[in-house]
Regions:
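Short aromatic/hydrophobic contact patches that present stacked aromatics
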Residues: 55, 136-138, 277
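Loop-rich catalytic cores of soluble enzymes, especially ATP-dependent carboxylate-amine ligases
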Residues: 83, 94-271
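Terminal catalytic/cofactor-binding subdomain
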Residues: 1-123, 131, 280, 288, ...
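Short, intrinsically disordered, mixed-charge
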Residues: 22, 80, 156-159, 163, ...
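Short helix/loop capping segments that flank catalytic or ligand/cofactor-binding pockets
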Residues: 6, 64-66, 147-149, 162, ...
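Terminal accessory/anchoring regions of large secretory-pathway or extracellular enzymes
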Residues: 13-14, 23, 247-256, 261, ...
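Glycine-/small-residue-rich active-site loops that bind phosphorylated ligands and cofactors
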Residues: 63, 142, 284
């Protein structure tokens, strides 16, 4: 019927997760409604993006051949489920058919807060959450000097990678002459936390400058007593240096986990965590999924 897989039902994400559990995956996180929203296996995980897009996060591996093998094994699992249920797997950077209002948001507190905040800072944030799909690659670094070299180079090359891997020319059933609707969507999502920042292109960049940048970005939420509390009125710097007016936030002591969560809500084209994450490519067909980490491996190492 040309519709996305629903979150729950006889043929759904929940049903797919049960199928994957039979293939050796273990149950992971549950939402507030006791519904399964992630799986894990041998250091890898399967999670859900806001519009039920599947995300495989592979385990740490030594080379791109191992990464490709792991990816193909998972894709074959999905393909088997798809054939059993007359489904089609689409490898594109943007949903070619569905309208935004037709897509179901998964019930997850973090995504609820983002859903309410996105329209305040851009016109396409909800499209980003529900209609985009990407291939990303993560790389280690030896020390700060090595990190800076890789980070700056990766930022400088991102426009080239975006062009090479552009693969989303269709929107709502028609070709709209935009080679990557995914990139077009990101350009008006949230300029504060997205894109390529000027300071990221300079060889004088260092970790302190990235921290300064991240501190200025609005914080989506704090998890207090098991609940996600909306903090989008505050940057992380505000939470550290000012006294919030809300009683539950004011009485809460920030932790390292809050900072780590905050870093995960920064959506620049190259993201810095305990590893380097390159994020500029559209999703594509199977061989292109492996091509992206191979491309970056040849450049960064």
């Amino acid at each position: 019927d040309k519709k996305r897989l629903k979150f729950d039902g006889s043929i759904s994400i929940q049903n797919l997760f049960q199928f994957l559990i039979e293939k050796g995956w273990q149950k992971g996180e549950y939402n507030a409604f006791n519904q399964l929203i992630s799986l894990s296996k041998n250091g890898a995980s399967v999670t859900l993006e806001p519009g039920c897009q599947l995300e495989l996060s592979g385990k740490i591996l030594k080379n791109v051949h191992q990464t490709c093998t792991e990816t193909y094994e998972h894709l074959h699992e999905l393909q088997e489920y798809a054939k059993l249920n007359n489904l089609c797997i689409i490898g594109l950077g943007f949903d070619p058919i569905s309208k935004r209002e037709d897509i179901e948001f998964i019930p997850k507190d973090r995504y609820r807060i983002m859903r309410e905040y996105m329209p305040k800072v851009g016109s396409r944030g909800l499209d980003m959450m529900t209609r985009t799909c990407t291939v990303q690659a993560n790389f280690d670094y030896f020390d700060e000097k090595d990190l800076i070299k890789k980070f700056v180079l990766a930022n400088r090359l991102q426009p080239l990678v975006m062009a090479l891997f552009s693969n989303s020319p269709f929107k709502e059933g028609s070709h709209n002459l935009i080679k990557s609707n995914r990139i077009h969507t990101w350009q008006d999502t949230d300029s504060e936390r997205c894109g390529i920042k000027k300071e990221f292109l300079d060889q004088s960049f260092n970790i302190e400058k990235y921290v300064d940048f991240a501190l200025k970005v609005k914080n989506y939420f704090l998890k207090i007593n098991g609940k996600h509390i909306d903090t989008t009125s505050y940057s992380f710097h505000d939470l550290v240096t000012k006294t919030p007016k809300e009683k539950n936030i004011k009485e809460y002591n920030l932790t390292v986990s809050d900072w780590i969560n905050h870093l995960s809500t920064i959506f620049t084209e190259v993201r810095l965590k305990s590893y380097l994450e390159v994020r500029g490519a559209d999703a594509g067909k199977w061989e292109m999924i492996c091509a992206l980490p191979a491309f970056w491996t040849g450049i960064l190492y």
